[in-house]
């Protein structure tokens, strides 16, 4: 079983495990899933076939989170859209499909990214999202669990300074026993650190510290969905923008470059090769290029090419097939990007640095896609949220176990 770090409340609500096989026909499009012996097979559920409602009528679905909102042990998911209301909704599994509930019924213009933790320390998970290039806001929403007839109260974390906040991460990065929030602020060209106030319900916006800045035109973005301890010193580290940042004390962090060419990418981190430091994966999310994984050889980061991807704006490391070895999950956005040729890839690892490439989906774009146990059966499913390809829409690929036979992918 995967050695899982705990979530932001100290629980392991994001599971990793086992797996099935299927060919599914959807209206107007036939989707086939690959077939390598030993790969996981998937069955598709979709808003197109009535398995869940669409988020709203807008066509720019930006952000996506997977977390257990109602504490029932099944991962729920959150989707944000930036052109219409409701701007933020969440989905709960009902045994056959997913019901939609509203988090924010106003237009908020959320950017890609976001994260979650128990901000108000009441035992449930609250969510954090940043505004896109149209504004300078970062917000948090108070989870009303267990009474979802009550509204999610929205409060400011940031409402001044530079615009655009593409990606946030939450973790105890200074090992003080309290989690911190870290956010890229692209138009300010800064990486911001926020300590959660003692009374976050009456405090806001929160004070912030600039822990890194840059002067070049190239933006920085990306964080792993699960933070890791890169240098094995017992502290979680901040990873993103082709770099990792080591805590030196107080609010001081040291920049360490993994690959300067991967500044504008999505990334993941995890133990792809057993023993030693965790590895890092970078995928060009808002452009085309080579997705790579990086391992520390004792002196420097050694790069290994996975493949050329077209706007690979989904990137995670998890044990998808439940064999005890970490796998790599990367998906192409579709629009902009490869359009109807968009693919979602999985590289199944053996724990020794060897990978078998597999295509989980071909024909539907995925943006900010996530892995989680979305039907409560104990394995990892795929949340396929597109940005603007065939939107508005949401798809879920349910993990059906390991294939026994192989067939050709079409």
What are these regions (language model features)?
Residues 11, 33-34:
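Local alpha-helix boundary/kink/capping signal
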Residues 22-32:
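Bacterial N-terminal signal peptides
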Residues 1-18:
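N-terminal secretory signal peptides that target proteins for export/translocation
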Residues 37-410:
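Beta-propeller-forming repeat regions
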Residues 11, 20-21, 47, 388:
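Sequence-pattern detector for short linear motifs
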């Amino acid at each position: 079983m995967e050695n899982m770090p705990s979530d932001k409340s100290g629980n392991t609500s994001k599971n990793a495990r086992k797996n099935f096989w299927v060919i599914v026909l959807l209206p107007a499009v036939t989707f086939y899933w690959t077939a390598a012996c030993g790969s996981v097979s998937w069955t598709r559920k979709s808003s197109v076939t009535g398995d869940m409602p669409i988020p709203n009528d807008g066509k720019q679905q930006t952000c996506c989170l997977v977390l257990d909102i109602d504490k029932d042990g099944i991962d729920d998911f959150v989707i944000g859209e930036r052109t219409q209301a409701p701007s933020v909704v969440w989905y709960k599994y009902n045994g056959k499909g997913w019901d939609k509930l509203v988090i924010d019924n106003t237009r908020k213009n959320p950017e890609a990214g976001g994260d979650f933790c128990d901000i108000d320390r009441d035992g449930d998970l609250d969510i954090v999202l940043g505004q896109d290039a149209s504004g300078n806001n970062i917000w948090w929403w108070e989870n009303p669990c267990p009474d979802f007839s009550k509204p999610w109260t929205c409060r400011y974390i940031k409402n001044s300074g530079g615009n655009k906040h593409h990606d946030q991460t939450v973790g105890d990065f200074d090992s003080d026993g309290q989690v911190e929030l870290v956010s890229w602020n692209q138009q300010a060209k800064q990486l911001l650190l926020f300590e959660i106030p003692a009374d976050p319900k009456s405090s806001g916006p929160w004070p912030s510290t600039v822990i890194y800045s840059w002067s070049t035109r190239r933006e920085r973005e990306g964080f792993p969905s699960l933070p890791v301890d890169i240098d094995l010193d017992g502290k979680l580290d901040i990873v993103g923008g082709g770099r990792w940042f080591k805590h030196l004390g107080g609010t001081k962090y040291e920049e360490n470059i993994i690959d300067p060419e991967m500044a504008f990418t999505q990334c993941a981190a995890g133990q792809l090769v057993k023993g030693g430091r965790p590895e890092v994966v970078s995928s060009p999310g808002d452009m085309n290029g080579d997705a790579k994984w990086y391992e520390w050889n004792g002196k420097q980061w050694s790069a290994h090419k996975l493949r050329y991807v077209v706007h690979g704006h989904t990137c995670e490391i998890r044990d998808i097939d439940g064999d005890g070895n970490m796998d790599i999950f990367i998906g192409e956005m579709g629009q902009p990007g490869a359009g109807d040729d968009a693919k979602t890839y999985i590289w199944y690892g053996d724990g020794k640095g060897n990978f078998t490439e597999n295509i989980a989906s071909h024909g539907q774009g995925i943006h900010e896609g996530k892995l989680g146990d979305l039907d409560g059966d104990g394995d990892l499913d795929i949340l396929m949220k597109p940005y603007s390809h065939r939107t508005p829409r949401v798809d879920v690929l349910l993990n059906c176990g390991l294939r026994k036979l192989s067939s050709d992918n079409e």
